[in-house]
């Protein structure tokens, strides 16, 4: 079950997995954001935690929560942000078992929840956070930097 919010839309989940499989077969670039990251993992055989035990770190009733993350040296996120980045968070689910073809590249040090991965050989990556709405008043991490990198690399 994939559920980026608290509501379930099985028909939408199936459609999104089919769209991902279509893109993957054609080696099209895919950037999964939040539920999109979860969807990629499940579509490739990974599993999810349906309701994480540490919600205070990853969501807030008042909007996005911000927390520190560690980034794997040598990854594209490391090239963009270095070894640490503060990111926004608004999720109650997370990756439990990562699909075999995916490489973990960012995680929350407080609970080891995965925050980003990249595919071993295809132009596919996912982030649990929201680069499109990250606020500079809470972090120096630029979501625009990630989006620009993805577009420049794969457009």
What does each model-found stretch correspond to?
Residues 38:
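Cytosolic ligand/metal-binding cores
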Residues 41:
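Structured adenosyl-cofactor binding patch, chiefly the S-adenosyl-L-methionine
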């Amino acid at each position: 079950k994939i559920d980026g919010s608290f509501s379930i839309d099985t028909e939408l989940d199936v459609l999104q997995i089919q769209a991902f499989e279509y893109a993957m077969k054609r080696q099209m670039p895919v950037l999964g954001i939040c539920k999109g990251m979860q969807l990629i993992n499940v579509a490739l055989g990974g599993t999810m935690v349906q309701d994480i035990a540490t919600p205070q770190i990853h969501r807030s009733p008042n909007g996005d929560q911000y927390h520190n993350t560690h980034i794997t040296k040598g990854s594209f996120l490391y090239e963009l942000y270095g070894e640490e980045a503060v990111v926004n968070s608004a999720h109650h689910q997370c990756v439990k078992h990562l699909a075999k073809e995916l490489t973990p590249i960012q995680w929350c040090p407080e609970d080891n929840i995965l925050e980003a991965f990249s595919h071993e050989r295809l132009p596919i990556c996912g982030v649990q956070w929201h680069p499109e709405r990250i606020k500079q008043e809470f972090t120096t991490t630029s979501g625009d930097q990630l989006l620009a990198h993805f577009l420049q690399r794969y457009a």
